[in-house]
Amino acid sequence: MRRLCAYVLLALFAGACRGADLVWPTDSKAFGEGEDYTSFIQPTASGRPESGLFGDTRNNGYRFHEGIDIKPVSRDKRGEALDGIYAAFPGKVAMINRIAGNSSYGRYVVMEHPGLDVNVYTLYAHLSEIDPSLKVGASLPAKGRIGRMGRSSSSIPIAKAQSHLHFEIGLMYGSNFKAWYAAQKYKEKNFFGNYNGMNLQGFDPLEFYRAARSGKIGEGLSGYIKSLPTALVVRVYTRNIPDFVRNYPTLADVNGEDCGWDIHFTWYGLPKKFERIKNPRVGAKGGEVEIVSYNPEEISRKCRRLIIVRDGQAPRLTNCLLYTSPS
């Protein structure tokens, strides 16, 4: 019966994602068999099960976690994790970091998935090893092997007991990040180009898998992403076409005035939709930025990825960056 449950789960995924395979990225069968998240999510050293989930789940809600941490199901005699790590969707390898000391993600791989209606990235971090044959640009099927689970990191050491896969699904802010970062004169070297974590924004992988399992992604990933709760709508006056619109056309509404864009954000900073301004303010000038609407509940969290402050009851942006490319 357990094997049948796992098969039915994959069949639901395949139908929900327009024929694309979607698989669990580790050897664990717990999610596919309907078990509670505590059976497959790895907590931090705090022991709190929710600390391995996505969102404001750490430090009493003040620290954001941009993925889920999946625990191992097998270990060697030394207690090190042995689980294989696999591509969640069919796609291509976009970035490989084999040097653990270069990132708090440790050894990690980023994949892109151009076969989907939204070219999301997936990220697989803290690996003990990456398949030696894996190359940037290589294609992998769903369940294609990436490496082995581990606890590699350049920052705080991860104990054996907390070995896990840090897994993300998300979007890239812009294609010009590498050049922008170089111009900022940061002290830290950017080893990862456009795949630097500053340029990637994940959404909740577990909620996405649950939605796929229940058949709620029949319209593809674009419908799912646009259905995420909106925290803030920011209006940017510009005649340029943002990179996001070029990269994710299914998340854009290009009907409207060519004087700017209304950008719909989730509370954690995911730009879920860009749309041409329908009702521009008279006298608005290029480069002006304003908040069109906001959800008080969504922006009242302790941990917000959006750079906003509150003046009385009205929020305002303290910084705004929009990546654009020459037409």
Predicted regions and their residues:
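A mature extracytoplasmic/lumenal domain signature
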Residues: P72-S74, R98, H113-G115, H126-S128, ...
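Bacterial N-terminal signal peptides
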Residues: Y7-A14
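Zn2+-dependent peptidoglycan hydrolase active-site motif and core
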Residues: E80-L82, A88-D131, K160, H164-H166
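Surface-exposed, glycine-biased beta-strand/turn segments
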Residues: G19-R107, F191-L321
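Positively charged n-region of N-terminal signal peptides that target proteins for export
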Residues: M1-L4
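Short, well-ordered loop/turn sites that connect or cap secondary structure elements
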Residues: A88, L134, S139-L140
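Conserved small/polar residues in nucleotide/adenosyl-binding loops
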Residues: Y323-S327
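Conserved, short, structured surface segments that act as functional micro-motifs
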Residues: S103, Y108-M111, A138-G215
